[in-house]
Amino acid sequence: MRRTGLAAVLGTMLIAGCEADTPIATSIVFDGESHTIDTGKVVCTRQPNGGGLVILAQGKSSQLVRIQLTQVGRITVQKVGLRYNDDVTGFIADPQEVTGVKVDDTYTVSGRMPPNQGESGWHTFKIQTTCRGYQDAVPHDTVPAIGAP
C-alpha cells in the first residue's frame, strides 16, 4: 500500500514538472487578425490590499501583453496593454470598454482600444492566456532608509 501511494505521488510530481516546461500560448486577435505569443513566461501576480491581479505574458522582445484586473463578484478589467512586433500596439485603461472572463485559470479579455497617434479608428481585440500559478507581489518596504527624515 505504501509503495502504491509513493508511486502515485512521484508520478504526479513528474507530470507536474513536465507540464511546467510546456509553453503557454497567449492568443491575440487584433482588428480581426490572429497572433500568438508562445511562451513559458506568463507571470500572474496578486497585488496587495485588494489591488487585483496583474498578468504579464512575454514572448520575444517585441511581444508583450499586460492585463490588470480586479475580481469582486465579477471580473473588472482595469487596464490592458499589448504589443506584437511593431504593427500591433494598444493600451486601454477604461473598464467600460473591456470585458473579462475567467474559466479555471484561463482569462479572456476583449473590447476596444482607442486609436494610436496618427490613426483614426478604434481597434477591437481579444486576448486569451492561462495562469499556471500565482505569486504575491512583494509589498513596498515601509521602514525608512537610514538617514531618511
Segment roles from a protein language model:
Residues M1-L10:
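N-terminal export and membrane-targeting signals
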Residues R83-Y134, H140:
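Extracytosolic low-complexity repeat regions of secreted or lipid-anchored proteins
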